[in-house]
Amino acid sequence: MRLSLAAAISHGRVYRRLGLGPESRIHLLRNLLTGLVRHERIEATWARADEMRGYAEKLIDYGKLGDTNERAMRMADFWLTEKDLIPKLFKVLAPRFQGQNGNYTRMLQIPNRKEQDRAKMAVIEYKGNYLPPLPLPHRDSNLTLLNQLLLGLQQDLHHNQDASLHSSCTVQTPKT
């Protein structure tokens, strides 16, 4: 019997489905983008935040073109469901990133949801916002597999050196 892994074959799909169909996916992304522009930091599942990230970056690129650009205005009008946020995009967010090319958002993993479905959660935010900074997760490098193996090797070497020192210190005297 041959064991095989079920491969996730996309068949040309280059984005996540995120719901019931393409229309609900677009509505979800529009609502998430509107919330991100309004609050500059939102909490969502990892998949939704990761999928929305590219659209948020592209929206800032369009915002940097200015409110006189017809295509930029059409994109802002489509993606932002609350029309009072369009001036914020062009007058607050776009000037903040004027000298920067890309990488306008930061995404951090937060603890999984507990009460519902244990979904992997994330916080996505625009960089340079007015909110207090998020604490960056501190990773204890002593707990990685490689460092644990190196620690075990060092302990074995010390144990072997101690054992060889004890055996060389004991001098056997010939019996007479």
From Swiss-Prot:
Q: Does the keyword Ribonucleoprotein apply?
A: yes
- Per UniProt, what is one GO molecular function of this protein? structural constituent of ribosome
Subunit field text: Component of the mitochondrial ribosome large subunit (39S) which comprises a 16S rRNA and about 50 distinct proteins.
What UniProt keywords are attached to this protein's entry?
Answer: Mitochondrion, Ribonucleoprotein, Ribosomal protein, Transit peptide
Does this entry carry the keyword Mitochondrion?
yes
What is the protein name stated in its UniProt record?
Large ribosomal subunit protein bL17m
Pfam families the record matches: Ribosomal_L17 (PF01196)
Where located? Mitochondrion
Organism annotation: Mus musculus (Mouse)
GO BP annotation list: mitochondrial genome maintenance; mitochondrial translation; translation
